[in-house]
């Protein structure tokens, strides 16, 4: 231990700087810690904490009081502290041959290396230190076994630190005992630490308990310019520190306060091993759990429970008026079709020609692309819409307000269960939202005046609609329809149908045509 560290050590124990300097000047700068403490105790110096004795304790007459700490010797408390420190450190067992050869660069048995190792552990406060060396190292050095500073061995032997393992000569040959077995056995019995760069592989195979002990209690070292340096992490970077490795009661590691690299975007929640300063006082929930807690929605709640209630009806002329039981539901105006809603509509469509309870299907008329006035192609006199609803013939002389309900349509009172219009979700948004007799988009019609465009619709909700569809609208409608069909049907079939009907942009009609194209040998015709 160097001079500044020694001074700091003794001042922590409570001694004055002058007393420590006086003792160090008497014993020398290289004096051991134990020798300095003994000299401080012998000369009568005591720590500053003990200079003011405690108040005398009252003892009943005729009884013998237990001697107080102030009534004990001047160095009793210091000895107890030193004894406690020494008892908390593990015993040290040094492989003398390995340490000496390591210091001598594996060429010379350097006894100075053993002294450096012993002094390093003494300065840390270890009291049980044993060094094992073969006894033949006491012999005079020879050319094949060079030894340097052999007097160090005798000095350590006098201090009861060095132990010679037995050896003898038989018929002129030296018989040497296995000193490694001594080292491992003593260290195992004392529950100490082995100081060596040897792995003792042969001894690990002899005893499984020794195998575990050697793996967990072997302390390696290095010499750097006559400086003994054990590693700070004897068992690797994830193992204990050197202080905990040499201590019987290792200190728990300090909690890691490393901040999470993801910060507020971390989704690990309570499973995150890093520190989150933004949530120190409440439970570290996952992001999904925090969102559920804020919105008040329980996990797994269906879409029907979170759907907002329908707004109550207003005046007859308002756009938010409640629809009639046979009114169609329309998508938002000028919006691209939603893929999820489109697939839901496909699941509700009956692609076959069977209309169920609405009546048997009628034969499809021959294909004709002749321009004409009137409604869509799938509306004819006495014909039905290819879906669950039927519309009246556009050639009727009645206005939409005077028309009776079309055949096959059963009106039900408001509020009762009714089948949902399957084609309503797929019609163009250019139709009035509240008119049950609205016409399909104008993009699939040839230019012409229709009776459906008369101003007899009542509230004038469609007064701003143009009779003729522009080319831009027609191109946008066909492009949206093509994209929607690509997501469901093969591209070649969609392209074939779109090429056969260049003027058709109604998504519902295109779906039926693609379905017919998919059937084997079915000719393309108007649905």
From Swiss-Prot:
Record Pfam families: RNase_Zc3h12a (PF11977), UBA_6 (PF18039)
Primary location class: cytoplasm
Region feature (Disordered): 48-75, 234-258, 296-339, 378-457
Documented effect of changing residue 95 to N: Inhibits interleukin IL6 mRNA instability
Domain (RNase NYN) ranges: 88-243
Subunit details: Interacts with ZC3H12A.
Protein name as catalogued: Probable ribonuclease ZC3H12D
Organism (species): Homo sapiens (Human)
Encoding gene, per UniProt annotation: ZC3H12D
């Amino acid at each position: 231990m160097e001079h500044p560290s020694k001074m700091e050590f003794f001042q922590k124990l409570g001694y004055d700087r002058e007393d420590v300097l006086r003792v160090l000047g008497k014993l020398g700068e290289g004096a051991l810690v134990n020798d300095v403490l003994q000299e401080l105790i012998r000369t009568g110096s005591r720590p500053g904490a003990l200079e003011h004795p405690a108040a005398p304790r009252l003892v009943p007459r005729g009884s013998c009081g237990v001697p107080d700490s102030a009534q004990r010797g001047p160095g009793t408390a210091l000895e107890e502290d030193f004894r406690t420190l020494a008892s908390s450190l593990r015993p040290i067992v040094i492989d003398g041959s390995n340490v000496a050869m390591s210091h001598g660069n594996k060429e010379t048995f350097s006894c100075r290396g053993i002294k450096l190792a012993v002094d390093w552990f003494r300065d840390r406060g270890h009291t049980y230190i044993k060094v094992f060396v073969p006894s033949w190292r006491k012999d005079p050095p020879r050319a094949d076994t060079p030894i340097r500073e052999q007097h160090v061995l005798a000095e350590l032997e006098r201090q009861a630190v060095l132990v010679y393992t037995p050896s003898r000569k038989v018929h002129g040959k030296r018989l040497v005992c296995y000193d490694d077995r001594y080292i491992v056995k003593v260290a195992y019995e004392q529950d100490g630490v082995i100081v060596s760069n040897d792995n003792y592989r042969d001894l690990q195979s002899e005893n499984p308990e020794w195998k575990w002990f050697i793996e967990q209690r072997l302390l390696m070292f290095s010499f750097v310019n006559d400086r003994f340096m054990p590693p700070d992490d004897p068992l690797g970077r994830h193992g204990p520190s050197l202080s905990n490795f040499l201590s019987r009661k290792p200190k728990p590691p300090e909690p890691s306060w490393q901040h999470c690299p993801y910060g507020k975007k971390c989704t690990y929640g309570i499973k995150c091993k890093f520190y989150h300063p933004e949530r120190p006082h409440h439970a570290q929930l996952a992001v999904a759990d925090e969102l559920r807690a804020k919105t008040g929605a329980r996990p797994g709640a269906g879409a029907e429970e979170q759907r907002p209630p329908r707004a109550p009806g207003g005046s007859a002329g308002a756009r938010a008026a409640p629809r009639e039981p046979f009114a169609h539901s329309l998508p938002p105006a000028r919006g691209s079709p939603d893929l999820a809603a489109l697939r839901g509509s496909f699941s509700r469509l009956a692609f076959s020609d069977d209309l169920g309870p609405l009546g048997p299907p009628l034969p499809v008329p021959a294909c004709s692309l002749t321009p004409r006035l009137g409604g869509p192609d799938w509306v004819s006199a006495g014909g039905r819409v290819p879906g669950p609803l039927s519309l009246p013939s556009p050639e009727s002389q009645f206005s939409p307000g005077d028309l009776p309900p079309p055949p096959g349509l059963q009106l039900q009172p408001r509020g009762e269960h009714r089948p949902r219009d399957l084609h309503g979700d797929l019609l163009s948004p250019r139709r009035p939202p509240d008119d049950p007799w609205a016409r399909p988009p104008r993009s699939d019609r040839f230019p012409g005046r229709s009776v459906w465009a008369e101003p007899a619709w009542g509230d004038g909700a469609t007064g701003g609609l143009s009779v003729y569809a522009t080319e831009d609208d027609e191109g946008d409608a066909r492009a949206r329809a093509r994209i929607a069909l690509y997501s469901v049907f093969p591209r070649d079939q969609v392209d074939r149908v779109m090429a056969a009907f260049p003027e058709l942009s109604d998504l519902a009609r295109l779906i039926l045509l693609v379905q017919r194209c998919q059937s084997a040998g079915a000719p393309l015709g108007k649905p």
